[in-house]
Amino acid sequence: MLVLGVESTAHTISLGLVKDGDVLGQVGKTYVPPSGLGIHPREAADHHSQMAPQLLSHLLYRHGVRLSDVDVVAYAAGPGLGPALRVGAVLARAIAIKLGVPIVPVHHGIAHIEIARYATKSCDPLVVLISGGHTVIAGYSDRRYRIFGETLDVAIGNAIDMFAREAGLGFPGVPAVERCGESADRLVEFPMPIVGQDMSYAGLTTYALKLLKEGVPLSVICKSLVEAAYYMLAEVTERALAFTRKSELVVAGGVARSRRLREILSQVGAYHGAEVKVVPDEYAGDNGAMIALTGYYAYKRGVYTTPEESFVRQRWRLDAVDVPWFWDLCNR
């Protein structure tokens, strides 16, 4: 079975192929906003519309397959930016209609988790999902991923990106801020707002910008911001590990590329006897392979729809989605 996956939730348009549960590959292009500006949804959508045809041709050519070989089409149905999501949905819908094949709507966050489980050969982990749009600590129980901690406002990646943009550090913000902080010789105290098992990151950005206006060296702010953000996440993760007693801790999403975050979470995992596994860099950011892979497992369990019902959902909680295929990844 050959599955084509389409990812277009935010700044990246990406297509991937999965054959019989194995990832063949992916291609993608990222919309980079003008310096000092955030992502404009319609401009991102225009970018995706322009890039999609050539990406599809390139992907098929690279792997020696024809469009007619595709058996199932999967697309990221949400959450995400409405105009960007619709570009991917329209592309997937058009291909499904042309080929007369099923179409599978995929939750973007769950796809991040499944590609991480696949790539790290994990079965039943506690998952730390961290990206521009997600900050969630989750674990499987009773048909769904249950949330053991999450952000109350903006995601960790978004918070750091916003500071990077205002400070003129460029995009993407997380690696830029981490590089900026490497030369710092000290830390300044940051607020670390944690409410129960939930975190608030919006205030960290505001506080960092306040320090910048007060003349605190940029490198010191960058290092302190990153340390505060990551240690907040580590505290909530540690509590979740103590509660769930999971033996695996999987780190997924674009921010999983952070070497400093890996160090901190590795210490948490070691303390609780959990093996820490980090998604490979090639699958950390938004990618079509994760959509195709999740679509493959979903379709095998009877989860699909018709082109007429292939809608998008800008807001879509991760714990609102059944994952009947969960144990299938343990039996590969």
UniProtKB/Swiss-Prot annotation:
GO biological process: tRNA threonylcarbamoyladenosine modification
Catalytic activity: L-threonylcarbamoyladenylate + adenosine(37) in tRNA = N(6)-L-threonylcarbamoyladenosine(37) in tRNA + AMP + H(+)
A Gene Ontology molecular function term of the record: iron ion binding
Cofactor note as given: Binds 1 Fe(2+) ion per subunit.
Subcellular location: Cytoplasm
Binding site for substrate: 129-133, 161, 178, 258
Transport keyword on record: no
InterPro entries referenced in this protein's UniProt entry, alphabetically: ATPase_NBD, Gcp-like_dom, KAE1/TsaD, Kae1_archaea_euk, Peptidase_M22_CS
Highest taxon of source: Archaea
Major localization listed first in the record, in broad terms: cytoplasm
A GO CC term assigned to this protein in UniProt: cytoplasm
EC number, as in UniProt: 2.3.1.234
Family to which this protein belongs: Belongs to the KAE1 / TsaD family.
Name used for this protein in its record: tRNA N6-adenosine threonylcarbamoyltransferase
Native organism: Pyrobaculum arsenaticum (strain DSM 13514 / JCM 11321 / PZ6)
